[in-house]
């Protein structure tokens, strides 16, 4: 693969990741998960002010895109960031927008 082809593939991958993150509530959820891995959907619903169904839809989209992972703990499902690139992007955004 040529250098240009590799760069194009990387750009497409980065654009897909940013697109999956590019909703204010999804960014808020990811910020919460970066500081508190293993947070329940109920807690994320409370923090974001979204309805349970809206929170669930955002979590499902991010899980389908490979951004987050879920783990069952008794009756709760706990969410964590799965993709290290997401952690790096969230850390950069926090440095720029939350000094």
From Swiss-Prot:
Annotated keywords: Activator, DNA-binding, Repressor, Stress response, Transcription, Transcription regulation
GO BP field: regulation of DNA-templated transcription
Disruption phenotype: Disruption of the gene affects the expression of many anaerobic and ROS-scavenging genes. The mutant shows higher H(2)O(2) levels and increased antibiotic sensitivity. Loss of the gene induces drastic changes in gene expression profiles under oxygen-limiting and/or sulfide-enriched conditions.
UniProt name for this protein: HTH-type transcriptional regulator YgaV
Positions of the DNA-binding region: 41-64
InterPro entries assigned to the protein according to its UniProt record, in alphabetical order: ArsR-like_HTH (IPR011991), HTH_ArsR_DNA-bd_dom (IPR001845), Metal_resp_trans_reg (IPR051011), WH-like_DNA-bd_sf (IPR036388), WH_DNA-bd_sf (IPR036390)
One Pfam family per UniProt: HTH_5
SMART domains per the UniProt record, alphabetical: HTH_ARSR
GO molecular function: DNA binding; DNA-binding transcription factor activity
PANTHER family reported for this sequence: ARSENICAL RESISTANCE OPERON REPRESSOR ARSR-RELATED (PTHR43132:SF2)
UniProt KW Iron-sulfur keyword: no
This protein's record includes keyword Transcription: yes
Induction: Part of the ygaVP operon, which is repressed by YgaV. The operon can be induced by tributylin (TBT), a toxic chemical used as a biocide and in textiles and wood preservation.
UniProt note on regulation of activity: In the presence of H(2)S, two cysteine residues form an intramolecular tetrasulfide bond, which attenuates the binding of YgaV to DNA. Both unmodified YgaV and sulfide-modified YgaV can probably function as either a repressor or an activator. Binds heme, which may influence the DNA-binding affinity.
Function: Transcriptional regulator that regulates large-scale gene expression in response to sulfide. May act as a global regulator responsible for redox homeostasis. It functions as both a repressor and an activator. In the absence of sulfide compounds, it negatively regulates many anaerobic respiratory genes, including formate, fumarate, lactate, nitrate and nitrite reductase genes.
Residues annotated as domain HTH arsR-type: 7-99
């Amino acid at each position: 693969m040529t250098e240009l082809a590799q760069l194009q593939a990387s750009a497409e991958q980065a654009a897909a990741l940013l697109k999956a993150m590019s909703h204010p509530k999804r960014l808020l959820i990811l910020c919460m998960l970066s500081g508190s891995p293993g947070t329940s959907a109920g807690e994320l619903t409370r923090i974001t002010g979204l309805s349970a169904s809206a929170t669930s839809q955002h979590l499902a989209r991010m899980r389908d895109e490979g951004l987050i992972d879920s783990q069952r703990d008794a009756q709760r499902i706990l969410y964590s960031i799965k993709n290290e690139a997401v952690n790096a992007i969230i850390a950069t955004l926090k440095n720029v927008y939350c000094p």
